[in-house]
Amino acid sequence: MAFVKLKSAMKEKFKEVGIRVARGRVIGDYQDALGLCHEYGFPVCIKPDSGVGAAATHKIRSEEELGHFFHVKNPYESYILEEFIDGKIVTYDGLTDANGNILFDATLVYEKAVLETVEKNADMFYYVDRNMPDDLREIGTKLLQAFNVRERFFHFEFFRLPDGSLVALEANLRPPGGHTMDMWNWANDADLYAAYGELVATGNFTAQMHFPYYCCYVSRKGVHPYRFTHEEVMARYGGNVVLFEEMPGIFAAIMGDFGYVIRAAEYQELMDIIHMISVTE
């Protein structure tokens, strides 16, 4: 099961299927890592070979930063070093039955990478897209077969490059994190928790997952001078806001101090709401 736990093994699985990946491998000592940095060029990305999401991920821009990383890293952890990919993160997600048939699939689009959000103390948003790109579904379907995904949720991450091509990032045989399960529900007026229970108990899946709405998480941080108050946002778009909450401090660097979950049937309306929440003076 290494290929569902270790990023280095995932990379090999992606290549077996014929999907492009970022150049990289597990590193040894400082000199080994420095040699790869010279081969790929700065910046590079270093992250635990075994881990979830962006936890303990570092963007390294120089030899000095590389030296600092080796000074503070966990000595008992294996790390993988990769070339830095400049692209937008998109996902191929969903659920399969016991025979590996796709019961529904979905895609998320992230406005910026987690590293950029933390580095710049920036706001972020990501949304459930109503429209599934054909190339994403084609690649995702191949991965489901390669990883033999049966009766479970899946969450495959990719970079969408400026030229439109895809580079595989990570495979997770679980639902996406955060509020994504709830966002799928709000995007469909569905109850996936009950639907999954029905699937496990009876083998049937009756949820209607046609995505009549876009659904988006939008963050706010207390340090930014927003043009519109929360009250003004709610007065104009309260009917589109399905959740507003104060985030626990442990999640604030990524998810913001406050989070809105919004939905809209049309893309432009979604972008208009995001703009009103996010625009600063």
Question: What positions do the PLM features span?
Answer:
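ATP-dependent carboxylate-activation loops
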Residues: 174-195
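Short, flexible turn/loop "capping" segments at secondary-structure junctions
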Residues: 48-49, 117-118, 251-255
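Active-site nucleotide/adenylate-binding loops and adjacent lid/helix of ATP-dependent enzymes
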Residues: 3-87, 97-101, 126-138, 142, ...
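Short secondary-structure junctions
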Residues: 18-19, 147-149, 236-239
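Peripheral (often C-terminal) accessory segments that flank ATP-dependent C-N-forming ligase machineries
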Residues: 195-281
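Short, charged, surface-exposed secondary-structure boundary motifs
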Residues: 2-9, 54-56, 115-117, 228-229, ...
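Phosphate-binding core of ATP-grasp and ATP-grasp-like enzymes
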Residues: 73-78, 83-126, 134-166, 172-180, ...
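Conserved hydrophobic/aromatic beta-strand scaffold that supports enzyme active sites
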Residues: 57-59, 80, 168, 217, ...
